[in-house]
């Protein structure tokens, strides 16, 4: 994907469907933030009577002949001294939404005068690029009118910046968003198509695409041979066999530092015998968003050729309902040897993650483990769709993730591992139950996973993306439905804190 181009001189720009001109909000009237103003001043002068320059304000002006573009879009950036990187991300996402609705496919984007920017030009350009890329995406439609979807942008030329600075940022963000789009496509896909086998094939495809990536897939028999009794239990009710996927990237083979990413891969969650209500089941094709996220992250890391070692583990299965389904009140033993009494078959995600954690400890020699899962409704209630909660046993890892979230505007919030609540997992007949009480559900789910670390000195973080992985509205910097949340944050984290 090569969407972005740059041109230092505005006068040498190529023809396009539209040009985006930025404005600052000042006391008297909006001030054009770029030197190209004189060329279009006669066009936008009248529009300024009703245009304030507020952040995110946009207005189209049709060009009757002058200039190289059919339309001028004036964009408010708000007050210069108040503009943040997240603001840049969101306003250029809005620009993309506006351009696409107007059927524009080629666009010239004028940068504000660099010397006037209060934030580093690299940050501005990165977030401009990310905002445009995030909304330059179509989720799948199956109607006869699918072809009437707003067209994608095919060429974006950023004016006022030399290619030496811009092109490196463009290529990097395009590579990252290939991973974001992969994540979104998988989460948005039909559950009958995005099966455990499909996830395995995607992993194999990445291994073919990148020489430094290897894929290994365990089928049902291999899962049973490894004594992954918790993953096998969840899979019992499905006509589709489970898979356990191991995808390894070796960017620094001589280093012992090793990051293991684990993604929950429940490709459809009916709740099992503890059947979900129909409305709650409606979006459960997205219950494999954790798996899709780690595939997207690994794709981006490999594309950027980062000097790190990363392995993605994906326990993949449906949680379906059948006469053979695993049953509440029964006890199943995981790969760790720990036994679990099933308090709810709808708390299946933590079961398959537990076997993946054990696999990581046994075979991967991890320095750190980071898992992603659409795990609890409690997290959605707590933090909504804009913030993902996370838990960690390591303050350094937690702080680094928090910083990465701030830099990428993918908000994380650390929640406590309240040890007192661990007793809610007590079972009289097994080592533990898979659910706690009806309170602090996100915390007790994290405490359940923490037990499978078995006190080994491994840094660990658990990201509950139940609220952020899938959105019901097209707003801010995200399209409707699958968001791809977490891919950008983790790639930033890996690049900044681990690429040494």
From Swiss-Prot:
It is found in: Cytoplasm. Binds 2 manganese ions per subunit. The gene is pepA. One of its GO terms (molecular function) is metalloaminopeptidase activity. Mn(2+) 2 binds at residues 264, 269, 287, 348. Mn(2+) 1 binds at residues 269, 346, 348. This is Probable cytosol aminopeptidase. The lineage of its organism: Bacteria, Pseudomonadati, Chlamydiota, Chlamydiia, Chlamydiales. InterPro entries: Leucine_aapep/pepB (IPR011356), Macro_dom-like (IPR043472), Peptidase_M17_C (IPR000819), Peptidase_M17_leu_NH2_pept (IPR023042), Peptidase_M17_N (IPR008283). Presumably involved in the processing and regular turnover of intracellular proteins. Catalyzes the removal of unsubstituted N-terminal amino acids from various peptides. Its EC number is 3.4.11.1, 3.4.11.10. It comes from the Bacteria. Its main location: cytoplasm.
